Structure formats: structure tokens, C-alpha cells
């Protein structure tokens, strides 16, 4: 998946060199909104010896708003919330149920858009602040997740259906981690968990 993300970013830069469309860039809207269905696929890592944290994939709707400073440079605010089941896979066999947690990760990306006829690829990078809420503790006494600041990379493409509506394919990689305190009933275990989700979305957008 990460190789696919890098290939799309490379393709976007190729478009910028070989396929800039002056006519397209003369007609742009200051605001865009997209509605996507996204797949959020965590790539979990932790600092626990003898066990690995497993975080489930989530499929949810997502809404974003984009404002263009000029024909190429824009800023995008991404809004979505996801629920993930959390397990602890113990080396040698066995799994501990750590319940579930909801993530609210508003993300702000600075984007650069290219133009190639009806195709408009783009790349972006920005910041993310993830809020953890709605925690279910599963088999342990308590789970406490610390809200965290992270970073994001993005690549995607819009395809114009007409002057107002367009289709969108978007891939984002978020780099985020959280400190978790796990109360087992016999003591509190501090754990640093890397979540680092890959997010793939497909949807429709509107210019206004």
C-alpha cells in the first residue's frame, strides 16, 4: 500500500511537468466539498515485549472542505470519526481483548493541484490532532489513551464530471502514536502505540 502511495505521488509530479492545461486553470472555484467512503487501515506497533497490539480496520463516511488560495494551492480540512477494536496478540498463543476506542482525527493539509484536462491530481501534507473517546476496556479494568499530534501525507486525483461535480480518489498516510495506560487490576502498564493508519477514500465532490 505504501508503494502505491508513492507511485501516485510520482504520477502527480509527472502530470505537473507534462500535462498542465492552461484552459483548465483559468476556471476554478474557491471552495470544494467532498463526500467519501474511506477505509482506515492502522499499521499498529508497540513497545511491549512478547506481545503485539492489533487494531482493526474501519470503514466510515468522511467529509472534507477545500479552499483554494489560487489555481494550484489549496488547504483541506478533513472530518471523520472511526471505531476500532483493539486486541493484544501474545507471542506463543492467546489474545487479550482490549475493547474498542473511537478516534476523531481532524486533519489539515496544504495541497498543490495539477491540471490535465478533466483530471486534476494533487499532493498534500499537513498536521493531524487525534482525540480518543468512547473507550471500552474489554478484559482489563481501564484503558486511558492520550490525545496526540501527528502528521499526514496525501495524494489523490479529481475527475471532472461537469463544471460543478467531480469524482475523487484519495490516499492519505497519517503518522500518529499515543501513550496508553492499561490498568490490569494488578498495576498500570504504560504502552506507546504507533497507529499510523493508511486511509483510502473514494467519493464525489462539488465546487461552489
Q: Predicted segment positions?
A:
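Hydrophobic alpha-helical segments of small multi-pass membrane proteins
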Residues: 106-108, 125-129, 146-157, 171-173
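Predominantly the C-terminal beta-signal and adjacent terminal strand-loop region
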Residues: 84-89, 162-208
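Hydrophobic h-region of N-terminal signal peptides that target proteins for export
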Residues: 10-17
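Gram-negative (and chloroplast) outer-membrane scaffold detector with strong preference
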Residues: 32-41, 64-137, 159, 195-208
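Outer-membrane beta-barrel biogenesis signature
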Residues: 5, 17-39, 43-46, 112
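Long, hydrophobic/aromatic N-terminal blocks
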Residues: 36-64
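Outer-membrane beta-barrel translocator domains and adjoining extracellular loop/strand segments
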Residues: 44-51, 86-95, 133-142, 179-187
